[in-house]
């Protein structure tokens, strides 16, 4: 079996999505297409995240990572839409036979997008599912004394309710920082 054909969706230049793409590429997986959401809410989320990690290094921009691929003779389509749930996305991905869609830090996405790829849609969630759902999972983990971690799961029309593929907890101790 070869490597899956997949589309990668992220909020425009969000550090989480940039790092996730860097990690995916480092493992030898290259998306067929990248679809960035350029929206005011996405901008707000990106700025909040950057403030949280202020001063720490972030992965190269999407354009830089794509240029590095292009220098190796690998071209990846990069489209920008105003919202991933929009009518704009389905025509873009229906042009490509996809095995998977990978969410790299998106807002909640529902509907036809979830049903299109042959093998499903995968999300990396910053919390241990099913105990800690939603975008502020690390904070809720601390507040409710739930271990901090990450979950990779298939997506369905619920919020962080799809089949769990992998859970990994990260021990966190008083005084630790993002570094």
Annotate each predicted stretch with a short phrase.
Residues 1-179:
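One-carbon transfer enzymes
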